Amino acid sequence: MVKSSLQRILNSHCFAREKEGDKPSATIHASRTMPLLSLHSRGGSSSESSRVSLHCCSNPGPGPRWCSDAPHPPLKIPGGRGNSQRDHNLSANLFYSDDRLNVTEELTSNDKTRILNVQSRLTDAKRINWRTVLSGGSLYIEIPGGALPEGSKDSFAVLLEFAEEQLRADHVFICFHKNREDRAALLRTFSFLGFEIVRPGHPLVPKRPDACFMAYTFERESSGEEEE
């Protein structure tokens, strides 16, 4: 059902158009300008301790926390030996791989919420990375500020298929800053795809008054319906 709707988003002007003469090699982080979904584990046994937390920078500068322009320190992986890329690689396990995707899982102390780094291979020389959080039956994806990287339209389509077919997710949530200039275009684009605006107070999203959330719910046939 997602595949039948993907063409609407593939041609959307919200995604950067492909340019001729692309650079021969590029690995693009789609969320690089708005880092990143983060997992904060707190003490106690309440449900709050395992809830996904969407904080885009550890030390925000002036301006909204959601998309601060201040430099962001590299993510420190719990249990790692520093903030280097080497530590990041050592603290991640291969989660899934095929001819289009390579997905690694960051090791965390929280066994209820998983951080997945999704790298889609558009060509041999061009790849796009998305950092997502899988919590329960929901996958959370942050839409970065500004024009998305070239090729992100195809990359996002593959990501949705992965969420449905491999993760068997019940919901996919996207989030972006409310005050961004292309907010109306994003709402229109993802509404065409089947996403719906999430009202404040929804139990599956964090309390972020500065952020807009949209949700896509996968419709699955029950075993009883299949027998009929």
From Swiss-Prot:
UniProt keyword annotations, A-Z: Polyamine biosynthesis, Transport
GO cellular component term, pick one: cytosol
GO function terms (MF aspect): ornithine decarboxylase inhibitor activity
Extent of Low complexity compositional bias: 36-55
Coiled-coil residue spans: none
InterPro entries cross-referenced by the UniProt entry: Acyl_CoA_acyltransferase, ODC_AZ, ODC_AZ_sf
Superkingdom to which the source organism belongs: Eukaryota
Pfam families in alphabetical order: ODC_AZ (PF02100)
Function of the molecule: Ornithine decarboxylase (ODC) antizyme protein that negatively regulates ODC activity and intracellular polyamine biosynthesis and uptake in response to increased intracellular polyamine levels. Binds to ODC monomers, inhibiting the assembly of the functional ODC homodimer, and targets the monomers for ubiquitin-independent proteolytic destruction by the 26S proteasome. Triggers ODC degradation by inducing the exposure of a cryptic proteasome-interacting surface of ODC. Stabilizes AZIN2 by interfering with its ubiquitination.
Quaternary assembly: Interacts with ODC1 and thereby sterically blocks ODC homodimerization. Forms a ternary complex with PSMB4 and OAZ1 before PSMB4 is incorporated into the 20S proteasome. Interacts with AZIN2; this interaction disrupts the interaction between the antizyme and ODC1. Interacts with FAM171A1.
Family classification: Belongs to the ODC antizyme family.
Protein name: Ornithine decarboxylase antizyme 1
